[in-house]
């Protein structure tokens, strides 16, 4: 048999549940990479992960590397042979070291001259001998920033290791990993089956743990099992609210999921639903239940890791904790309602936003001004925008947000309603944090969008203004995410705003002069770079982006309209020829820039029908295209310009631009310049060629 299954299991103390799936994926990927590097073929890889183990099963792993032919370089030809082409001592010595005769040596030309070399057949090594080093190398590559050491071991790992399985087929791979000798024994559930379980062959691993150890080893299967059990248990009361992040975490906490249903005091339903959900999620990792109308019910789902002989006791324990936590939340909420958002403004002055940029109170006042400025540009109520901007950060100093930071904005929404602030202001306080991540929903109304953009613009200007732009993968102030949020809001909400004007306004709102005098330009370039990355993710060709960028639009919505117009233009049959013609025009004009003294076209200097035809078509199309340009109907404008293909082709076929007659030459250059300007006001089509 030339292949066997290979099994690795690392048994340890409970792994971090939020990182378990990521660790499992990383281990599988690094082992795959190392096997490929060693030129060991295999069919596929399965990964397993539970709180107490990380495992990888490799199916049909080759038992030996393939035989390889390697080249070994020797001395130069000059050193290897004398004038009579007789092998020298150096040549004999090299041949002897390779185990061949001098007649079997070959000559190869390189950049450094001619050298002799020998082809050696290298037999492949046994997989059994290679595996220990392969696994060691894979483990070193695991993303474990908080690895720990235990006992008197020198080895580091995420958690202390208690056992290791290394099996190739039915054979043990003799090795010591992470301070433990490899064996063929795994362990079952910590409480239900703590004894060792003998694994006779790798393919039995998952089944043995399930039937003997009460462990569902496959992370994905366990997660879907938990989902199904939660939904089934909740269906008796209503419908479970399943947070995918919490489901992932709970899957990383249990090996044998058991579902129980508990309840809390109905009086707590008077609290905002987000408070109830967050309390249950953060403190007890439980799932809420709602009715058909979406209202919360006084029940929750517990995912336990044991089949208790007295499940009621487990439920009562969880209920006691949940009720106590909800009582705390109710206390925080009632306390917070005693102080209005506006009266919290002075307390924001005690919270530093950034040492060089002042406090959160300073930031709130800057957002107030910038939100009003944006509101004026898009013709909505400036006073409401200013009010929402001023109060946008006030809930950050509330007791509830201090306890649950993820409720920022949400609590501000409820407190604003309690303070009888306008509904739009309350919504803006909640929604100005949107979008929180890639693909997240956007603010629903324009007032919220104003505050959201103002907040992000202020942050970008401030941080870049003190020369702390993101570098590499370091972005502590999440400026890249802020830039993408601005772009998505402006483009998807169809808000036409001059980005450069916004940045300058934000810069002027800072009470102190920012150290970076070029902050507005650098911030603009930073945001446009995020726009480029966004389009690349949407598979917009880089050439299309560069073509539009060449026209320097400062309005992201306008930029997007041009992108779509150029993409449509590329579908036209005339597109390639026009792009090539524009490139030709661009090259001619670059070389003859000094001769472009006059932009006026003199028809009396034409001496061919081709010149008249192109000039007449340009004049006819220019008026129509310029009107479409003013309406920002770029798609139709470029479609109209496509009709110039024929007169442009005829012009280049019949007319010599660089003639000796200076007047005619300059006149023809002026004609080409007019053609270029007509196209380039939308995008530089020549860059598509």
From Swiss-Prot:
Keyword Glycoprotein recorded: no
A Gene Ontology molecular function term of the record: ATP binding
Gene Ontology cellular-component annotations: cytosol
Localization of this protein: Cytoplasm
Protein EC: 6.1.1.14
Coiled coil regions, renumbered to chain: none
Catalysed reactions, as listed in the record: tRNA(Gly) + glycine + ATP = glycyl-tRNA(Gly) + AMP + diphosphate
Enzyme class, broadest EC rank: ligase
GO biological process: arginyl-tRNA aminoacylation; glycyl-tRNA aminoacylation
Pfam families: DALR_1, tRNA_synt_2f
InterPro entries for the chain: DALR_anticod-bd, Gly-tRNA-synth_bsu, Gly-tRNA-synth_heterodimer
Range of residues in the leader sequence: none
Keyword Methyltransferase: no
Entry keywords, A to Z: Aminoacyl-tRNA synthetase, ATP-binding, Cytoplasm, Ligase, Nucleotide-binding, Protein biosynthesis
Family: Belongs to the class-II aminoacyl-tRNA synthetase family.
Subunit annotation: Tetramer of two alpha and two beta subunits.
The protein's name in its UniProt record: Glycine--tRNA ligase beta subunit
Species the sequence originates in: Coxiella burnetii (strain Dugway 5J108-111)
Gene label: glyS
């Amino acid at each position: 048999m030339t292949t066997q299954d290979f099994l690795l299991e690392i048994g340890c103390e409970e792994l971090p549940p939020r990182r378990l799936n990521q660790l499992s994926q990383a281990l599988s990927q690094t082992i795959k990479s190392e096997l490929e590097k060693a030129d060991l073929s295999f069919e596929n890889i399965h990964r397993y992960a539970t709180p107490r183990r990380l495992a990888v099963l490799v199916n049909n792993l080759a038992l030996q590397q393939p035989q390889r032919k390697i080249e070994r370089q020797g001395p130069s030809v000059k050193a290897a042979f004398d004038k009579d082409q007789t092998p020298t001592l150096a040549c004999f010595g090299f041949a002897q070291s390779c185990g061949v005769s001098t007649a079997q040596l070959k000559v190869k030309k390189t950049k450094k001259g001619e050298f002799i070399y020998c082809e050696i057949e290298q037999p492949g090594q046994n997989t059994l001998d290679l595996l220990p080093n392969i696994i060691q190398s894979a483990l070193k590559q695991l993303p474990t920033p908080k690895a720990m050491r235990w006992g008197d071991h020198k080895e580091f790992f995420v958690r202390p290791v208690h056992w290791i399985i290394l099996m190739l087929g039915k054979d043990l791979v003799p090795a010591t990993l992470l301070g433990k000798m490899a064996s063929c024994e795994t362990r079952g559930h910590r409480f239900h089956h703590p004894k060792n379980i003998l694994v006779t062959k790798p393919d039995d691993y998952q089944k043995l743990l399930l039937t003997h150890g009460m462990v569902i080893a496959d992370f994905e299967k366990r997660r879907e099992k938990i989902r199904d059990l939660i939904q089934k248990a909740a269906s008796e009361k209503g419908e479970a609210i399943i947070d995918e992040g919490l489901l992932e975490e709970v899957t990383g906490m249990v090996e044998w999921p058991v579902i129980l249903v508990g309840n809390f005091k109905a009086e707590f339903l008077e609290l905002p639903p987000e408070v109830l959900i967050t309390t249950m999620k953060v403190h007890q990792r439980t799932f809420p239940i709602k009715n058909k109308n979406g209202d919360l019910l006084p029940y929750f789902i517990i995912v336990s890791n044991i089949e208790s002989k007295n499940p009621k006791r487990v439920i009562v324990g969880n209920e006691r904790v949940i009720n106590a936590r909800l009582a705390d939340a109710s206390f925080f909420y009632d306390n917070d309602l005693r102080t209005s958002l506006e009266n919290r403004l002075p307390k924001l002055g005690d919270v530093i936003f950034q040492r060089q940029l002042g406090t959160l109170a300073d930031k709130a006042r800057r957002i107030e001004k910038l939100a009003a400025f944006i509101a004026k540009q898009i013709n909505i109520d400036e006073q409401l925008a200013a009010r929402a901007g001023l109060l946008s950060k006030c809930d950050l100093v509330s007791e509830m947000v201090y306890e649950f930071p993820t409720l920022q904005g949400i609590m501000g929404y409820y407190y604003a309603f309690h303070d009888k602030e306008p509904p739009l202001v309350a919504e803006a306080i909640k929604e100005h944090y949107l979008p929180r991540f890639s693909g997240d929903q956007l603010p629903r109304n324009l007032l919220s969008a104003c505050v959201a953009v103002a907040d992000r613009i202020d942050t970008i200007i401030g941080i870049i203004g003190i020369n702390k732009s993101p570098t590499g993968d370091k972005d502590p102030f999440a400026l890249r995410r802020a830039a993408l949020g601005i772009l998505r809001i402006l483009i998807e909400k169809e808000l036409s705003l001059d980005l450069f004007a916004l940045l300058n306004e934000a810069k002027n709102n800072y009470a102190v002069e920012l150290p970076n005098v070029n902050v507005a330009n650098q911030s603009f370039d930073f945001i446009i770079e995020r726009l480029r990355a966004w389009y690349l993710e949407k598979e917009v060709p880089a050439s299309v982006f560069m073509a539009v960028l060449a026209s320097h639009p400062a309005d992201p919505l306008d930029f997007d309209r041009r992108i779509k117009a150029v993409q449509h233009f590329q579908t036209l049959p005339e597109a390639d020829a026009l792009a090539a013609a524009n490139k030709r025009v661009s090259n001619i004009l670059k070389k003859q820039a000094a001769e472009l003294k006059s932009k006026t076209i003199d028809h009396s200097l034409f001496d061919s029908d081709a010149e008249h035809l192109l000039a007449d078509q340009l004049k006819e199309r220019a008026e129509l295209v310029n009107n479409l340009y003013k309406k920002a109907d770029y798609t139709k404008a470029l479609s109209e310009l496509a009709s110039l293909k024929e007169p442009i082709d005829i012009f280049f076929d019949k007319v010599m631009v660089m003639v000796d007659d200076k007047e005619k030459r300059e006149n023809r250059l002026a004609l080409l310049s007019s053609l270029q300007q007509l196209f380039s006001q939308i995008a530089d089509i020549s860059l598509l060629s």
